[in-house]
């Protein structure tokens, strides 16, 4: 069985915003990846950005500078 660890999960209102986040993070070599929204979270488009919890400040700053609108930021076991 795979062990779950606490992750930072950023949800988006639209798939377009989620894909923009993926593109921006790849360009800037930022950590994380797109995942389906975990069951315990009910949110927007069904896609979320998943990264280590310690990256929250850097990722929120990156989204702000990149003009990406997120829905919510969660910490949950993934």
Report each predicted region and the residues it spans.
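Short connector loops at helix/strand junctions that flank enzyme active sites
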Residues: 5, 27, 42-44, 68
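A short linear hydrophobic-aromatic micro-motif
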Residues: 31-37, 71-72
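C-terminal structural segments of small proteins and small subunits
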Residues: 50-78
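Short, flexible, solvent-exposed loop/turn segments with mixed acidic/basic and small polar residues
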Residues: 1-2, 34-40
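Short glycine-/aliphatic-rich beta-strand segments at the starts of folded cytosolic domains
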Residues: 2-11
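Small/polar loops that bind or transfer phosphate-bearing groups
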Residues: 10-13, 51
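Short proline/glycine- and acidic-rich turn/helix-capping motifs at secondary-structure junctions
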Residues: 39-45, 75-78
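Short amphipathic alpha-helix segments
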Residues: 14-31
């Amino acid at each position: 069985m795979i062990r779950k660890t606490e992750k930072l999960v950023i949800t988006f209102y639209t798939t377009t915003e989620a894909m923009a986040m993926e593109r921006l993070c790849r360009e800037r070599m930022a950590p994380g990846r797109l995942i389906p929204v975990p069951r315990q979270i009910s949110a927007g488009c069904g896609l979320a950005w998943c990264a280590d919890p310690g990256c929250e400040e850097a990722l929120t700053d990156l989204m702000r500078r990149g003009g990406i609108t997120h829905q919510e930021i969660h910490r949950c076991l993934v």
